[in-house]
């Protein structure tokens, strides 16, 4: 596909695989899906805009219970795009409210056949209350796995059209995951193993409800990622509306974004929308986590250094302000806000209060959605007291190292990030890596028994060793995996020519 088209087409893909989202305060889903098989991108965009406008108008009328006025608007939208999942679903709701139960079930079936799969929303939707005892409705619910599988297969087909034959594609029905990766089969297998283990651990530790829908996990090539995500510094994102996770590379960003996916499923099951400080706090908490047995154990990450420095400059936010932050302010001040939220979650985790806080928060959500009440309840402290205790705890933490230090262990190579490991860009002449047989272009994917997919994870692993230690690095070279023993050198004894060694 021409590079100039991929970003535009990918926007259509996002729309295509988007399922209905819960509208607030109405009970109707509001997201839009793509027009059917557009003859051209311009034509598709024109149809999308018209269908979206009609859909919004219909929802506004339905919110006011103006069913008679909403019906022709929805029918016009459906005529333009007979496979628009949200409009089909909303029309089913309208018919149910009118008492046309058989027709309502029929349109639910049409929506599901077109790709609508948000059965969590359906089971809570009061508009469908009159259908729940119908045999036809119960039969429809029994077909949920089939509808979801068919929808997932359509997503796979769409991804293949966007990214072509150089990617690997896989549908994991057991775990409800869809993969499109610019990696080899070994890396895809290890990614699946990591995400499966992460999900199992986070379900055991925190989230009560599992995925009830398929999530697409995309690891693009560097070139494709730059076309998809134009904003610098964004390593990945998760769109719950599209049930789509895209990461520039595996590693800490992938763990962060997949936590969002699992958290979103837990929120959806209870009909809640948690504030950004909780969502980003939980995702940041697990970024640098490593497994101890089957348990994913959080630990400090690079954000700690930033908030410690900000605290010395008196730039941290009072906790009372942090919990009230809306998304625009939080994102605008991401360096501090993400760091504070993640560190507060780690404080709760290490004081054995995280699960208690999260459960209490969900129970008291209707009383206080900010989290203030839950924090004060589980800690038995006021918010200012929590702030003071957390701050003292945080400032005593050891900063996260960005290098092994002047006399620390090194492999003797300049390193850069790839999408699935650490790329060897240049060897230090006569250094440990060169002596061990490493080559420019090798990709480091493991240190000793641990996976390593990004530089942020590499240094904390390497710092556990000292110069002179022999360590086995797992590398990929020309599609082959090699266990490479290497005797680590001392940084101060190497030529000063590289940034990352």
Regions found by a protein language model. Give the residues of each.
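Juxtacatalytic substrate-recognition/specificity segment
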Residues: 159, 165-275, 286, 290, ...
């Amino acid at each position: 596909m021409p590079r100039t088209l991929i970003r535009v087409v990918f926007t259509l893909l996002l729309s295509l695989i988007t399922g209905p989202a819960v509208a607030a305060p109405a009970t109707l889903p509001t997201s839009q899906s793509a027009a059917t098989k557009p003859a051209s991108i311009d034509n598709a965009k024109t149809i999308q805009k018209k269908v979206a406008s009609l859909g919004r108008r219909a929802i506004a009328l339905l919110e006011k219970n103006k069913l008679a006025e909403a019906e022709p608007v929805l029918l016009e939208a459906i005529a333009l795009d007979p496979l628009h999942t949200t409009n089909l679903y909303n029309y089913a709701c309208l018919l149910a409210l009118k008492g046309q139960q058989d027709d309502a079930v029929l349109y639910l079936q049409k929506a599901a056949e077109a790709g609508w799969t948000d059965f969590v929303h359906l089971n809570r939707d009061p508009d469908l209350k009159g259908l729940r005892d119908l045999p036809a409705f119960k039969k429809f619910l029994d077909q949920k796995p089939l509808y979801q599988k068919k929808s997932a297969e359509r997503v796979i087909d769409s991804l293949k059209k966007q990214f072509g034959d150089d990617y690997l594609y896989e549908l994991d029905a057991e775990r409800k995951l869809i993969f499109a990766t610019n990696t080899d089969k070994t890396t895809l297998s290890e990614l699946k193993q990591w995400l499966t283990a992460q999900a199992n651990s986070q379900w055991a530790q925190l989230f009560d409800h599992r995925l009830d829908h398929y999530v697409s996990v995309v690891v693009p090539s560097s070139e494709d990622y730059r076309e998809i995500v134009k904003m610098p510094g964004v390593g990945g994102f998760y769109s719950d509306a599209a049930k789509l996770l895209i990461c520039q590379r595996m590693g800490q960003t992938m763990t962060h974004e997949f936590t969002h996916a699992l958290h979103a499923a837990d929120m959806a099951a209870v009909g809640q929308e948690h504030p950004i400080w909780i969502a980003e706090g939980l995702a940041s908490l697990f970024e640098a986590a490593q497994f101890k047995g089957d348990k994913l154990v959080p630990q400090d990450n690079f954000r700690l250094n930033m908030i410690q420095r900000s605290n010395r400059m008196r730039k941290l936010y009072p906790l009372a302000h942090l919990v009230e932050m809306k998304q625009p302010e939080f994102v605008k001040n991401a360096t501090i806000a993400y760091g504070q939220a993640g560190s507060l979650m780690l404080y709760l985790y290490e004081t054995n209060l995280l699960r208690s806080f999260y459960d209490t928060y969900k129970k008291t959500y209707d009383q206080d959605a900010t989290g203030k009440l839950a924090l004060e309840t589980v800690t038995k402290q006021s918010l200012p007291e929590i702030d003071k205790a957390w701050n003292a705890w945080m400032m005593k933490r050891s900063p996260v190292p960005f290098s092994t230090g002047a006399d620390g262990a090194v492999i003797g190579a300049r390193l850069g990030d790839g999408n699935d490991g650490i790329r060897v860009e240049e060897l230090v002449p006569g250094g440990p890596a060169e002596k061990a047989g490493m080559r420019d272009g090798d990709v480091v994917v493991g240190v000793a028994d641990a996976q390593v997919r990004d530089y942020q994870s590499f240094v904390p692993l390497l710092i556990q060793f000292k110069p002179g230690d022999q360590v086995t690095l797992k590398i990929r070279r020309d599609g082959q995996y090699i266990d490479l023993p290497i005797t680590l050198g001392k940084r101060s004894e190497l030529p000063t020519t590289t940034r990352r060694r």
